[in-house]
Curated annotation (Swiss-Prot):
Gene that encodes it: Pi15
Role summary: Serine protease inhibitor which displays weak inhibitory activity against trypsin. May play a role in facial patterning during embryonic development.
Protein name: Peptidase inhibitor 15
PTM field: N-glycosylated.
Recorded superkingdom: Eukaryota
Species assigned in the record: Mus musculus (Mouse)
């Protein structure tokens, strides 16, 4: 089956399983946090060849405008959560995460990966056929899951496979607003032919966003409720902007383009 390229569709994956009738088993153990910064950096530095992933040949993995749009949208969403968050950290762009996202997007595999990184990273995926005006058309469906989410735990919108693989999904949203997931890197790749659950999509636009430290730990809330910035980590020095613990201009996304 080959989809008409004029038809615009967005399909999403989460690290737990897919919403509605199409599901995906969780490829990671989300009950054992492995979000140590050093461990994450070590995993990201592992040669991509060892995971049978083609090396990215482009210097940039996403356009500057798309990168800024994705990053700003995440921070807007994070700063406006309800109930308000006391420890929500400002999200910054991470070049290593972007490189790892590009390496995976280049495989055109409609699944999470590579497996050796999923212990350390959160990951949201989106694929689309047809033209689109803004990259946010591939990102906003993740946020739209908020309508099915009730703080603090994604109860009814968190299907558990294989016993209960149906119902709405909200773990894309909770990854977006996981307080300690303060770094993101994304990549876009156009796949000439991409197998999406048995259907071949021509010129599929594949978006991969990687997050660190990863979120969606079972039994944990995405953030602490309270007065915004009242429980920021000491490393932020009390800096706060738009309800987010702010690290300062030297670490924002502009660093990537110096």
């Amino acid at each position: 089956m080959i989809m008409n390229s004029a038809v615009s569709l967005v399909i999403l994956l989460s690290l737990l399983c897919e919403a509605h009738t199409v599901v995906l088993l969780n490829p990671t153990d989300s009950s054992l946090p492995a979000n140590n910064f050093t461990d994450t950096e070590a995993a990201l530095s592992t040669p991509l060849e060892s995971a049978d992933i083609p090396k990215a040949r482009r210097k940039r993995y996403i356009s500057q405008n798309d990168m800024i749009a994705i990053l700003d949208y995440h921070n807007q969403v994070r700063g406006k959560v309800f109930p308000p968050a006391a420890n929500m950290e400002y999200m910054v762009w991470d070049e290593n995460l972007a490189k790892s996202a590009e390496a995976w997007a280049a495989t055109c595999i409609w699944d999470h990966g590579p497996s050796y990184l999923l212990r350390f990273l959160g990951q949201n995926l989106s694929v689309r056929t047809g033209r689109y005006r803004s990259i946010l058309q591939l990102v906003k469906p993740w946020y739209d899951e908020v309508k099915d989410y009730a703080f603090p735990y994604p109860q009814d919108c968190n299907p558990r496979c294989p016993m209960r693989c149906f119902g709405p999904m909200c773990t894309h949203y909770t990854q977006m607003v996981w307080a300690t997931s303060n770094r993101i890197g994304c990549a876009i790749h156009t796949c000439q032919n991409m197998n999406v659950w048995g259907s071949v999509w021509r010129r599929a636009v594949y978006l991969v966003c990687n997050y660190a430290p990863k979120g969606n730990w079972i039994g944990e809330a995405p953030y602490k409720v309270g007065v915004p910035c009242s429980s920021c980590p000491p490393s932020y020095g009390g800096a706060c902007t738009d309800n987010l613990c702010f690290p300062g201009v030297t670490t924002n996304y502009l660093y990537w383009f110096k």
